[in-house]
């Protein structure tokens, strides 16, 4: 379509198709199909990328965001050429894969082209904004257009369906599917808008209606949407206008394609939203529209405010939506009601019920006092809702709180709890809303129903998309099940039926399984014993619960179906009970409340009120409601009444869904897939993973593949022959008969098309995608040619007729002129005047006769027309009714067929089950006999146990009596405690007064006083209860002995019962397994039950008896549990004996429970066995289920009680232990306090005031005493601990003394070693100073050397630049030379050999230099920052390396001796270090303890003084009392005695501390001696180190001489370099001469430049890679010689270049292969280099760590001289560090050896052809490296050697840094050269592009010139024809005139 044609779409054109300019730009965009690709990405699924390289099945690509990735080659997917950008049909993509489809959709979406074809269906992406693509202009533009003639659009899909309906005479359907928020509802509205616009009823006069508000049928169809959306749409998390119901809209058309009528079917209204919404969601729109206050009269009528937060049902989530104007929507809804011809009463009824639901949510109820029943908490809202519903408020509240329930044949009033009332209100509100919505749909259908004839229909399906929420319930299962069925229908239609059609037609086709079969999931949900079936079955049983439903699901499906899984519950999320694997993902479902939702129960009392409501609409809604009891009573009237009342929600949904699928299968479906681009509702943003998930789930990619692989278009042979015969009429002659198939074969065979694009079936010809469009284009072109020819002939004929008319006119004019002249001559005759008067009169008479005849004929025709119209209307009405009946009959036949199939399957299954069950019944009868025998035995055992239980009960009764006595005594003691606490309250007041007087001591003593008061209370109570408790203990001990005997008997009985219990449990397990297998099958076997009736009745009676006994035992267990609880609480407050007794009682009760449990287990076994046989009768099913539920509850309760009792036992044991501890403490306190308390109680009556004051003082004393006792206890514990530690120390000291005696023997040797170390340290310090001076000079020398080195490297860089230039020129000349070498093959072979040799040499040099550079670069990169600090160590290590080479043998001997001594000293030092550490820690501990004890002693002394002062005060106060002085004196003496004891204990502790201090002092002295010895040894080591430093200085001198020699060798290398520069200059001159010669041959080489450029690029890459690798001078000289030889050869062969071009091309290919090989080798070397760098980096970091640790060790060693303990720790660390360094050193030595060995090999290979000077230098380098290696080996066992190896590494680091700088310079030079080369290439490419553009311009001008010449020729021929024609006309005129 051109831009001019797209102008018909108006402003929507830019949103539908790219302009011609954009298409042209896209086609001319640069694109390389080899490199442009898609690569996988973790975040974006796929990203665009360019291939950088391919190697070994791996591809390296650079993504569009600059990231480089390496992936497998099969993961790379090619991009489509630019002309396919934003393609409208993705089936036409060249490369069809996931990223191509994704990016096509993404690019179109970015341009706001939201519709895209995908094979046979359409994909639409939600734009989240308004686009102008749905106006009337666009509708008109799409009308009658073929799919290929217009851009993709929902209107195009709709028009195609409309055209198919008319041409194929078949019903159509449009299935709009997608996730929630993808835009399904909007597209549905657009489809309806399109049909209403293009297929409106033709005659406008018929649309006129006397009722102005009703509107036309198309208006009513369009206005049905706003009405339904107001009541059925709501805001959700993902969509602001989400349809919460599904709808199938059928638009009926007449035979001519005009609208006839419409109807709507709805599915699954989400009625739970009426009473509950999530936070981010809201209720249905109608509630907020009413509350928007746009129509205030509505608020007054409904008695509501305009604040949504006043109503609970509508304010749980959000109350407003930014994208929706509720007030405007209210007007739209109200006007929609008017257009749909709702009456005012109906509208008011709908609004009233909506308002009543809001008032329902505000009704409040509360619980009656002392009852569980509910009563109203205010009646205002109930009054409002009752008024709006036309009810009585009191009756409504009564029905809610006290509903009438039918029990048997009578009705009983039942009281409801508050929760039950609220649940009932919610259920009623949901039911009212749902029934009102369904009534609205029925009412709208009645409006849309017309008497017009209906021939066909187009159905539009808009149903809720697949839903996966955090909380998925029954509604989500129904919605997802519906989507599963629709997806299966899509898959079946697209994949299965399509391929079955091919096989049926006999086309060669291999069946492709696209893996899209969803039948397993569908069967899991809907088949017998599926989820829905089990749910409906559970709803039939009154005792069933959600958990029994879950258990059945698990039993039937877990592990048996792959689609049914156990969920993974995550903390923080809602609990899930099972998971289903749907096509769109795995969904976790929560089954809570499913049974209630499925049964959907209502309060039938309130429903009865609804049925009698004065509001007509309310009574209508519930007029058809029938409960279970009404169903029973209505048996006689109608058989279906009862069945309908028991129909569950799931069954109703399945029935509606099956009808929908049946309807869809009879239509031709058109699929529209809606895609949600992102979760944020952001326009223009596409989330790639989200879109890819939807594409995979929706089968978009599979649809495209089947469209491309299969044959989506097919035509019957007859239709094809009739339509396309025009393409070649000669192939099918008209005169003879030819079979339609043969005619089609001949016709297609004669056409110029791809004959693999179609296949012939038995009845149809099949076409691949696109071929039918091509045939249509050919047909249109043929028709246009034929029509053009016809038009030409017609125009010619018309012109000839016109010419003839002109001639006739001319002749007529001549005749008229002659007649006029004649008339003018006779007009005045009298006879002529008479003629003029008579003539008109004759004609008027004739016309009157004709008019009369016509009127008569008109009357007859009018009568006939009226009769035919009446007859036609009757026939049309009959036809409509017959069609409806036919459709209904078809549905019934289909349903009957399905039922018949199900019945047959069930019959077969029942026959099989019957055989199995008969065999199992026999087994069961045998087992029943065995069980009866076992039952008899168990009953006997049970009697014995009952006897034992009775005996135990007697014992328990006795125990209960004793417990009752204990309880009474406990209460008495508690009363006494209360009295005492009252008295103590008075004491507390006095204490408070005294504490005010003693403010200084308030904070310290207040808490102690309170604690003491509480203890005194306890003492009072305990002393009083002690005597009584002792008596009770004696009684309890006697009963305890009896209980022990009973316990032993019970133990024996328990063991016996446990054995029996195991046997019964095994038999129970077997029976349970059999029961689960037979449960469902035995329901359908009624005819076998009669044989077992008598046995069942007996068993039932026995079960009832056992059940009664079980209840009695259970009651008895509960009583025992209560007794145990009471006993547990009492045990918490009594002593050890009571706790022991309670434990014994608990064990007895536990044994009793076990004995009772055995009987209960037996009862359960009998009951289960009874339940299995009772299941054989349907009448006993309910009783069996009740027994099972009761048994399960008892089992659970019993298990819970046993577990609880076990926990109680554990708790009581813990409490018992705690009480035992408290008892022991209390006994100790009682012994101390009882005497004091007795004396205080005696003195209390006489001296109350004095006693209180004295008691206060005594309390203070006691507090202090307790503190003293605690501190004394602490001291005693510390003393005991110190004594043990002293004992340990004494033992250790003895060992140390023995060890010291051994150490003293080696003391002399150690002291000598320490002196040596000190001397070494001093020498090393002096050497450091000397080295510092030497460092400055060496730095100066190093700077000079660095400058020389830099100059040398600059010169080397210049050499490299010249060399690279020469190499490039040589490569150019070599290519030219090779092109001309056709006649000199022998010379070319020699050149090839030389080139191969050069390449080999280059590779060897590359390997050598690469190895050397890698080692140097690695060491340099890391240690660059530390080079200044490490220079001293470098010089020192160089000097040491030279000097130590001479003294190696002597030093090795000395080193071995020192090593031995060092190890011995280290071991001794370790032991002494450990001893020192332990002694120091002990010393610190003792010091701390001593200080603490001193502090305590001081505090005690101060407290003693205070106490003495207070005692003196008390004695004065006691003097006044007189009588109690003697008693108080005793108390004082006791306190003094205790004080003296404390003092003596403190003195003993002090003495022990002094003793320990003496020991510690002795240990310190010994420690100081050891430290002094160690210091002396360190001094000796320092002296040795100084000596080593002096040796190092001598080595530095020798290294200086070697450096001078190195400088001289470098100067010699500079001289050689300068000489080579001169040689290179001469070669440049020669090359310039050769260039002048070569310029003459450039003209002949243009044809081969394209090949040479690629080769040149590859050679340049190889040269650059070699330049990066530091080539040496020998290779440069050898190449120069080769270059001179080649230049001479090139001069000789320049003239022959043209003849040798063809041979050179072949040689170029071989050379490029060699270059690629070289490049791959270079890359491998570089990778190896990087690996070695990383290894060396790791080694360097480890060495750095070792150096740092060594430095830390040195500092710690210095500190060790001043602090022995710290020195020992640092020595230990030094020892660990040295061991670590030794290991590191060995690894470093091995690594350096490997690297050195490789370096030597590389240098030997690289320096084969070098000069002697270079060989000397390399030999010198190898000598130095050998010396370094020897030095590293010699110093391997000591820390000194480690430091020297580190310094050597630093030297290498410095050298590497210099080499790195040189390499950087070389790299810069190479980069400059590469830039120049790129510039030359760019210039050449620009010239080539300019040439191409000039050539294209020339071709264009040439083409235009040819066209102009053709036009001139055509014009000239036309002029000649016109001239000839004019000459003929002139001649003809001349002839006529003659």
Swiss-Prot record:
Limits of the IQ domain: 783-812
Record Pfam families: Myosin_head, Myosin_N, Myosin_tail_1
Biased composition (Basic and acidic residues): 1925-1938
Record comment regarding domains: The rodlike tail sequence is highly repetitive, showing cycles of a 28-residue repeat pattern composed of 4 heptapeptides, characteristic for alpha-helical coiled coils.
Protein name per the record: Myosin-6
Residue ranges of the region described as Disordered: 1909-1938
Something else known: The cardiac alpha isoform is a 'fast' ATPase myosin, while the beta isoform is a 'slow' ATPase.
Chain residue ranges for the region called Calmodulin-binding: 790-807, 816-833
UniProt keyword list: Actin-binding, ATP-binding, Calmodulin-binding, Coiled coil, Cytoplasm, Methylation, Motor protein, Muscle protein, Myosin, Nucleotide-binding, Phosphoprotein, Thick filament
Coiled-coil ranges per UniProt: 842-1938
GO CC annotation: myofibril; myosin complex; myosin filament; stress fiber; Z disc
Keyword flag Phosphoprotein: yes
Myosin N-terminal SH3-like domain mapped to chain residues: 32-81
Chain positions found as Phosphothreonine: 379, 1277, 1284, 1311, 1515
Disulfide bond sites: none
Binding-site residues, ATP: 178-185
């Amino acid at each position: 379509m051109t831009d001019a044609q797209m102008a018909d779409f108006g402003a929507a054109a830019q949103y539908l198709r790219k302009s011609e300019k954009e298409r042209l730009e896209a086609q001319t965009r640069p694109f390389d199909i080899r490199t442009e690709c898609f690569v996988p990405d973790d975040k974006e699924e796929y990203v665009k990328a360019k291939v950088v390289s391919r190697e070994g099945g791996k591809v390296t690509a650079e993504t569009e965001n600059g990231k480089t990735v390496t992936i497998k080659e099969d993961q790379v997917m090619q991009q489509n050429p630019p002309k396919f950008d934003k393609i409208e049909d993705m089936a036409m993509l060249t490369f069809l894969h996931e990223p191509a489809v994704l990016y096509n959709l993404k690019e179109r979406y970015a341009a706001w082209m939201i519709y895209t074809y995908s094979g046979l269906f359409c994909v639409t992406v939600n734009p989240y904004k308004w686009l102008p693509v749905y106006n009337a202009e666009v509708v008109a533009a799409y009308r009658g257009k073929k799919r290929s003639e217009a851009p993709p659009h929902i209107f195009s899909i709709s028009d195609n369906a409309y055209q198919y309906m008319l041409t194929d005479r078949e019903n159509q359907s449009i299935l709009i599917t997608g996730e929630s928020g993808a835009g399904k509802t909007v597209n549905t509205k657009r489809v309806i808008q399109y049909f209403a616009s293009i297929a409106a009823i033709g005659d406008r006069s018929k649309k006129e209606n006397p009722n102005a508000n009703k509107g036309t049928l198309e208006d009513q169809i369009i206005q049905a949407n706003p009405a339904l959306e107001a009541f059925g749409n709501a805001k959700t998390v993902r969509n602001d206008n989400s349809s919460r119901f599904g709808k199938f809209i059928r638009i009926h058309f007449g035979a001519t394609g005009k609208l006839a009528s419409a109807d709507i079917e709805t599915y699954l209204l989400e009625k739970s939203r009426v009473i509950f919404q999530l936070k981010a969601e809201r209720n249905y729109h109608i509630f907020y529209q009413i509350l928007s206050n746009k129509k205030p009269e509505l608020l007054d009528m409904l008695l509501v405010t305009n604040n949504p937060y006043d109503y609970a049902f509508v304010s749980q989530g959000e109350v407003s939506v930014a994208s929706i104007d509720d007030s405007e929507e209210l007007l739209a809804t109200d006007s929609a009601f008017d257009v749909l011809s709702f009456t005012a009463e109906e509208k008011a009824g709908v609004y009233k019920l909506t308002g009543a639901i809001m008032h329902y949510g505000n009704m409040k109820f509360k619980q009656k006092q002392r009852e569980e029943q509910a009563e109203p908490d205010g009646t205002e809202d109930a009054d409002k809702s009752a008024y709006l519903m036309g009810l009585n408020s009191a009756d409504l509240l009564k029905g809610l709180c006290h509903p009438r329930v039918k029990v048997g044949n009578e009705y009983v009033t039942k009281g409801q709890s508050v929760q039950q009332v609220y649940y009932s209100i919610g259920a009623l509100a949901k039911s009212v809303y749902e029934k009102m919505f369904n009534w609205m749909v029925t009412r709208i259908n009645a409006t849309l129903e017309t008497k017009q004839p209906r021939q066909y229909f187009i159905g539009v399906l808009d149903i809720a998309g697949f839903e996966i929420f955090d909380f998925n319930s029954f509604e989500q299962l129904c919605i997802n099940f519906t989507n599963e069925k629709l997806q299966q229908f899509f898959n079946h239609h697209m994949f299965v039926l399509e391929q079955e059609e091919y096989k049926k037609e006999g086309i060669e086709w291999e069946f492709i399984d696209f893996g899209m079969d969803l039948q397993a999931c569908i069967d899991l949900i809907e088949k017998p014993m599926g989820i829905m079936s089990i749910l409906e079955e559970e709803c039939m049983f009154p005792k069933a619960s959600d958990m029994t439903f879950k258990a059945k699901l698990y039993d039937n499906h877990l592990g048996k179906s792959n689609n049914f899984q156990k969920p993974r519950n995550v903390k923080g999320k809602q609990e899930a009970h099972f998971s289903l694997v749907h096509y769109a993902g795995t969904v976790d479902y929560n089954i809570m409340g499913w049974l209630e939702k499925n049964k959907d129960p209502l309060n039938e009392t309130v429903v009865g009120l609804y049925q009698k409501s004065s509001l007509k609409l309310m009574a209508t809604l519930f007029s058809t409601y029938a409960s279970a009891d009404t169903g029973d009573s209505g048996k006689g009237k109608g058989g279906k009444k009862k069945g309908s009342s028991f129909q569950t929600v799931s069954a109703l949904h399945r029935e509606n869904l099956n009808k929908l699928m049946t309807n869809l299968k009879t239509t031709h479906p058109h699929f529209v897939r809606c895609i949600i681009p992102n979760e944020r509702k952001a326009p223009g943003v596409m989330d790639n993973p989200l879109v890819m998930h939807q594409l995979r789930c929706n089968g978009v990619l599979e649809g495209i593949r089947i469209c491309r692989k299969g044959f989506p278009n097919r035509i019957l042979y007859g239709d094809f022959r009739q339509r396309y015969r025009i393409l070649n009429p000669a192939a099918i002659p008209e005169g003879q008969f030819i079979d339609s198939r043969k005619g089609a074969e001949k016709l297609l065979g004669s056409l110029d098309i791809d004959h693999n694009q179609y296949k012939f079936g038995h009845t149809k010809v099949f076409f691949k995608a696109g071929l039918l469009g091509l045939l249509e284009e050919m047909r249109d072109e043929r028709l246009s040619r034929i029509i053009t020819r016809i038009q030409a002939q017609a125009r010619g004929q018309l012109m000839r007729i016109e010419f003839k008319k002109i001639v006739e006119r001319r002749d007529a004019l001549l005749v008229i002129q002659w007649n006029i002249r004649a008339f003018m001559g006779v007009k005045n005759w009298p006879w002529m005047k008479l003629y003029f008067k008579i003539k008109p009169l004759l004609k008027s008479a004739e016309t009157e006769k004709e008019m009369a005849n016509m009127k008569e004929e008109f009357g007859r025709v009018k009568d006939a027309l009226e009769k035919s119209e009446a007859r036609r209307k009757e026939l049309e009405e009959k036809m409509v009714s017959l069609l409806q009946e036919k459709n209904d009959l078809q549905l019934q036949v289909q349903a009957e067929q399905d039922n018949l199939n199900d019945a047959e399957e069930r019959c077969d299954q029942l026959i099989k089950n019957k055989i199995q069950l008969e065999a199992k019944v026999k087994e069961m009868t045998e087992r029943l006999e065995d069980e009866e025998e076992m039952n008899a035995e168990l009953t006997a055992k049970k009697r014995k146990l009952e006897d034992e239980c009775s005996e135990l009960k007697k014992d328990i009764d006795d125990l209960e009596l004793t417990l009752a006595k204990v309880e009474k005594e406990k209460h008495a003691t508690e009363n006494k405690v209360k009295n005492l606490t009252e008295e103590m309250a008075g004491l507390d007041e006095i204490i408070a007064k005294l504490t005010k007087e003693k403010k200084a001591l308030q904070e310290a003593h207040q808490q102690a006083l309170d604690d003491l008061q509480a203890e005194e209370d306890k003492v009072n109570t305990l002393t009083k209860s002690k005597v009584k408790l002792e008596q009770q203990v004696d009684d309890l001990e006697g009963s305890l002995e009896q209980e022990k005997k009973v316990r032993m008997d019970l133990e024996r009985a328990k063991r016996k019962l446990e054995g029996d219990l195991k046997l019964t449990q095994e038999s129970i397990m077997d029976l349970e397994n059999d029961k689960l297998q037979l449960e469902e099958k035995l329901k359908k076997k009624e005819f076998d039950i009669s044989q077992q009736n008598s046995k069942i009745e007996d068993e039932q009676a026995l079960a009832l008896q056992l059940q009664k006994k079980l209840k009695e035992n259970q009651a008895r267990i509960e009583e025992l549990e209560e007794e145990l609880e009471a006993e547990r609480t009492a045990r918490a407050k009594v002593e050890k004996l009571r706790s022991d007794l309670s434990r014994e009682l608990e064990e007895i009760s536990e044994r009793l429970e076990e004995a009772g449990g055995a009987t209960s287990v037996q009862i359960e076994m009998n009951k289960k066995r009874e339940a299995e046989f009772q299941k054989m009768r349907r009448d006993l099913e309910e009783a069996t289920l009740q027994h099972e539920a009761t048994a399960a509850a008892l089992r659970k309760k019993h298990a819970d009680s046993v577990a609880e009792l076990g926990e109680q036992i554990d708790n009581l044991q813990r409490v018992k232990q705690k009480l035992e501890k408290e008892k022991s403490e209390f006994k100790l306190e009682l012994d101390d306090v009882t005497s004091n308390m007795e004396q205080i109680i005696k003195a209390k009556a006489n001296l109350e005031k004095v006693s209180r004051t004295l008691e206060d003082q005594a309390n203070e004393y006691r507090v202090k005493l307790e503190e003293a006792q605690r501190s004394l206890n602490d001291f005693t514990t510390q003393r005991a601990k110190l004594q043990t530690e002293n004992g340990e120390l004494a033992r250790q000291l003895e060992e140390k003394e023995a060890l010291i005696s051994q150490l003293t023997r080696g003391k002399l040797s150690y002291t000598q070693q320490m002196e040596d170390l000190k001397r070494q340290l001093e020498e090393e310090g002096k050497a450091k100073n000397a080295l510092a001076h030497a460092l400055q000079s060496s730095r100066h020398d190093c700077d000079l050397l660095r400058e020389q080195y830099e100059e040398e490297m600059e010169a080397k860089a210049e050499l490299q630049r010249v060399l690279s230039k020469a190499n490039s020129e040589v490569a150019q000349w070599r290519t030219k030379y090779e092109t001309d070498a056709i006649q000199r093959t022998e010379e070319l072979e020699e050149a090839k050999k030389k080139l191969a040799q050069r390449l080999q040499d280059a590779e060897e040099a590359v390997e050598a230099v690469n190895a050397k550079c890698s080692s140097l670069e690695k060491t340099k990169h890391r240690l660059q920052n530390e080079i200044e600090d490490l220079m001293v160590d470098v010089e020192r290590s160089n000097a040491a390396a030279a000097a130590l080479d001479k003294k190696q043998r002597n030093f090795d001997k000395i080193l071995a001796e020192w090593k031995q001594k060092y190890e011995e000293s280290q071991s001794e030092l370790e032991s002494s270090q450990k001893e020192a550490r332990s002694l120091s820690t002990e010393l610190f501990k003792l010091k701390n303890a001593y200080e603490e004890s001193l502090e305590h002693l001081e505090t005690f002394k101060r407290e003693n003084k205070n106490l003495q002062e207070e005692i003196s005060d008390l004695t004065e106060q006691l003097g006044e009392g007189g009588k109690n002085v003697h008693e108080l004196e005793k108390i004082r003496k006791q306190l003094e005695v205790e004080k003296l004891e404390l003092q003596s204990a403190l003195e003993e502790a002090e003495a022990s501390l002094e003793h320990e201090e003496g020991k510690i002092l002795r240990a310190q002295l010994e420690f100081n001696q050891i430290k002094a010895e160690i210091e002396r040894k360190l001094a000796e080591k320092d002296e040795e180190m100084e000596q080593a430093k002096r040796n190092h200085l001598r080595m530095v001198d020798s290294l200086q001489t070697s450096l001078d020699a190195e400088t001289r060798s470098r100067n010699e290398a500079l001289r050689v370099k300068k000489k080579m520069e001169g040689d290179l200059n001469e070669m440049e001159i020669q090359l310039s001469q050769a260039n002048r010669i070569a310029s003459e041959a450039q003209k002949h080489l243009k044809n081969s430049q394209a090949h040479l450029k690629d080769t040149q690029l590859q050679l340049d890459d190889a040269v650059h890679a070699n330049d990066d690798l530091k080539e040496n001078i020998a290779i440069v000289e050898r190449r120069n010689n080769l270059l001179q030889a080649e230049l001479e050869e090139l001069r000789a062969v320049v003239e022959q270049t043209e003849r040798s071009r063809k041979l050179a091309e072949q040689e170029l290919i071989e050379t490029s292969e060699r270059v690629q090989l070289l490049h791959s080798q270079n890359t491998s070397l570089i990778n190896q280099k990087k690996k070695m760098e990383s290894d060396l980096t790791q080694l360097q970091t480890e060495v750095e760590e070792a150096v740092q640790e060594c430095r830390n060790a040195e500092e710690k060693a210095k500190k060790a001289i001043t602090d022995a303990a710290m020195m020992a720790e640092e020595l230990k660390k030094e020892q660990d560090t040295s061991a670590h360094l030794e290991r590191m050193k060995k690894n470093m030595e091995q690594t350096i050896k490997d690297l050195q060995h490789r370096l030597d090999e590389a240098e030997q290979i690289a320096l084969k052809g070098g000069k002697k000077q270079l060989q000397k230098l390399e030999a010198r380098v190898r000598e130095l490296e050998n010396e370094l290696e020897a030095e590293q080996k010699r110093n391997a066992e000591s820390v000194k050697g480690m430091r020297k190896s580190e310094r050597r590494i630093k030297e290498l680091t410095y050298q590497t840094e210099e080499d790195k700088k040189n390499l950087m310079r070389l790299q810069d030079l190479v980069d400059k050269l590469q830039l120049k080369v790129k510039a030359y290439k760019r210039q050449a490419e620009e010239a080539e592009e300019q040439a191409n553009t000039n050539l294209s311009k020339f071709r264009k001008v040439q083409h235009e010139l040819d066209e102009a010449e053709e036009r001139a020729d055509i014009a000239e021929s036309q002029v000649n024809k016109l001239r000839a024609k004019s000459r003929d006309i002139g001649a003809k005129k001349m002839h006529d005139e003659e």
